[in-house]
């Protein structure tokens, strides 16, 4: 209990003037004196508080006299709640505890260092560099801490390290950040946005390229919160400006044809510019460096001149948009740069300054051009399917010489030129011959007659094969029969038996030959009948006509003979009709 409460209880118990004393205690002179003191304390903080501030500008709390009285009367003398009267100075908040070494394990990354700003703002400055006991955050060595609570058993690492860091990865991260800020390490330009965030502040490395007045800005480093437009306008970020990096183009977009030849130049330039970024950042306080600016102009590459196209590749933290290529060139620049084609391009090759139409595939780069030696089966004069004519000079087989008798078109007719954008390119002369010269369409009806003849020939061949097969079979059968019927040499005792066996063998051979001839005759007759039945419809009329003529002549002949015999009978000679009848019978 406080002293005022004790006095009030005593006055209530004593009675009498207790009410007046209570009013004096509530509204008396003491209260009037205390109010201006509190107002003065809130307006002007006491000098003792300023003397006890820590090194990095965060005040240590000081206990006032009234709080001393209340603490002396309270039961808990080691209360952790401390009240600070006055303005809280800006800076990174410290969470130190009394009696122990102040260790801040809630690590935040450093913000932008742009030098001192003129005015102090109330609240927490998010752009202030993080520090632990006045030491910059990236230079703090974790091994210097005596107490390492994150190593204790059962400790949760997420209470001490944010964003999945542990002790080893945090050391590596600090080392890398120090090297990047000193300009010793080149920031890699990748296709994704690399963000390393710790608690509230983010550091964003944005790959992309900007052109302002013809100069390229390869990358832009942002630290702190993104989207703070006031601070971004007041404090411009660092930009290194040099020539076009070829690796920023996506594969779907048509790059310049000589990107490979300029790649080595731009990579060396990027290394030099990156190494010098950190030096002038520390020296000039991240202001724009006049030394790195280059005059706008064109890059001279062997064979042709190309201008710098405008590429913008900014990304925010929550956007996954592709790098946009915006070609902003006037017509006069195109006409000045490409009034004449390069000397080594053929007349039929597509020009480089015109964008390809959207419905055609992009022209291949020098590295992806099709090989000049085609696979077997494809003539070298025909480009592979899916590819336009390759850039650069065509192979010698595509260029017709003066002595070659090729005409400029197909079959002495000029072929239609295929459009490529707004420019038409004629076909290359001396290409493959046309289809009508390969396939003769005027004699298509010969094909069917030829096919019928081939079929008949195949049939005859099959028949001959069958006959040969049958003959072979019969010969083997004969040999087997002779083997079966042939007696042993001991049987041939007499000449008669030998003669009888020879006669038997000859008779068997004659019989077999007769049967074979009969089979062949029978087979030929069958074949003839098949052929006749096949062509019966065409021959039937002529056969009928022939048979009727034969029948008529035969009848006429018989009629004449019968007349003669009648005349002979009338003459009265008997042997004459017999002779005539005998003559007539064989005629029948």
Curated annotation (Swiss-Prot):
Gene that encodes it: FIP1L1
Amino acid composition bias (Low complexity), ranges on this chain: 259-270
Name of the protein in its database record: Pre-mRNA 3'-end-processing factor FIP1
The species this protein was found in: Pongo abelii
Protein's job: Component of the cleavage and polyadenylation specificity factor (CPSF) complex that plays a key role in pre-mRNA 3'-end formation, recognizing the AAUAAA signal sequence and interacting with poly(A) polymerase and other factors to bring about cleavage and poly(A) addition. FIP1L1 contributes to poly(A) site recognition and stimulates poly(A) addition. Binds to U-rich RNA sequence elements surrounding the poly(A) site. May act to tether poly(A) polymerase to the CPSF complex.
Signal peptide region: none
Residues with PTM Phosphotyrosine: 420
GO biological process, any: mRNA processing
Listed GO CC annotations: mRNA cleavage and polyadenylation specificity factor complex
Family: Belongs to the FIP1 family.
Phosphothreonine PTM positions: 488
Pfam families referenced in this protein's UniProt entry, alphabetically: Fip1
Residue ranges of the region described as Arg/Asp/Glu-rich domain: 451-484
Disulphide bond pairs: none
Residue numbers carrying Phosphoserine: 70, 72, 74, 289, 486, 490, 494, 548
Main location: nucleus
């Amino acid at each position: 209990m406080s002293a005022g409460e004790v006095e009030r209880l005593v006055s209530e118990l004593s009675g009498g003037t207790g009410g007046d004393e209570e009013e004096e205690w509530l509204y008396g002179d003491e209260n009037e004196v205390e109010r201006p003191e509190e107002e003065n304390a809130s307006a002007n903080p006491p000098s003792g508080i300023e003397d006890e501030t820590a090194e990095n500008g965060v005040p240590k709390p000081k206990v006032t006299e009234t709080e001393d009285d209340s603490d002396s009367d309270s039961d808990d003398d080691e209360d952790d709640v401390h009240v600070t009267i006055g303005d809280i100075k800006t800076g990174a908040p410290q969470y130190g505890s009394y009696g122990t070494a102040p260790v801040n394990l809630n690590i935040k990354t450093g913000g932008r260092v742009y030098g001192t700003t003129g005015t102090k703002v109330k609240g927490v400055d998010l752009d202030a560099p993080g520090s632990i006991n006045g030491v910059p955050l990236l230079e703090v060595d974790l091994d210097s801490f005596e107490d390492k609570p994150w190593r204790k058993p059962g400790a949760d690492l997420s209470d001490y390290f944010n964003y999945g860091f542990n002790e080893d990865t945090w050391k590596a991260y600090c080392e890398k950040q120090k090297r990047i800020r000193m300009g010793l390490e080149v920031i890699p330009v990748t296709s994704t946005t690399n963000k390393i965030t710790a608690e509230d502040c983010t550091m964003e490395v944005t790959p992309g390229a900007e052109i302002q007045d013809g100069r390229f800005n390869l990358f832009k480093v942002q630290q702190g919160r993104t989207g703070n437009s006031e601070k971004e306008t007041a404090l411009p970020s660092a930009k290194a400006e040099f020539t076009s990096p070829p690796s920023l183009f996506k594969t779907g977009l048509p790059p310049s044809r000589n990107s490979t030849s300029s790649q080595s130049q731009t990579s060396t330039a990027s290394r030099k510019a990156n190494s010098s970024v950190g030096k002038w950042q520390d020296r000039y306080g991240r202001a724009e460096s006049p030394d790195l600016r280059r005059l706008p102009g064109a890059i001279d590459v062997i064979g042709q001149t190309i201008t710098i196209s405008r590429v913008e590749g900014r990304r925010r933290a929550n956007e996954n948009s592709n790098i946009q290529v915006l070609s902003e060139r006037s017509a006069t620049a195109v006409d000045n740069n490409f009034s004449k084609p390069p000397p080594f391009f053929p007349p039929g090759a597509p020009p480089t300054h015109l964008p390809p139409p959207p419905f055609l595939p992009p022209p291949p780069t020098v590295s992806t051009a099709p090989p000049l030696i085609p696979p077997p089966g494809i003539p070298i004069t025909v480009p592979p399917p899916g590819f336009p004519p390759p850039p650069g000079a065509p192979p010698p087989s595509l260029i017709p010489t003066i002595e070659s008798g090729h005409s400029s078109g197909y079959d002495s007719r000029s072929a239609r030129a295929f459009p490529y954008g707004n420019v038409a390119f004629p076909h290359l002369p001396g290409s493959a011959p046309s289809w009508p010269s390969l396939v003769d369409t005027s004699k298509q009806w010969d094909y069917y007659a030829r096919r019928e003849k081939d079929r008949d020939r195949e049939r005859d061949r099959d028949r001959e094969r069958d006959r040969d097969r049958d003959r072979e079979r019969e010969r083997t059968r004969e040999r087997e029969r002779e083997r079966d019927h042939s007696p042993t040499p001991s049987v041939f005792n007499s000449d008669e038996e030998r003669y009888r066996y020879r006669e038997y063998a000859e008779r068997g051979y004659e019989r077999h030959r007769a049967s074979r001839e009969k089979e062949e005759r029978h087979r030929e007759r069958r074949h003839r009948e098949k052929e006749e039945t096949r062509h019966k419809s065409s021959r039937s009329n002529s056969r009928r006509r022939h048979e009727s003529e034969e029948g008529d002549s035969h009848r006429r002949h018989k009629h004449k003979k019968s007349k003669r015999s009648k005349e002979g009978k009338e003459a009265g000679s008997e042997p004459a009709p017999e002779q005539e009848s005998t003559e007539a019978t064989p005629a029948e």
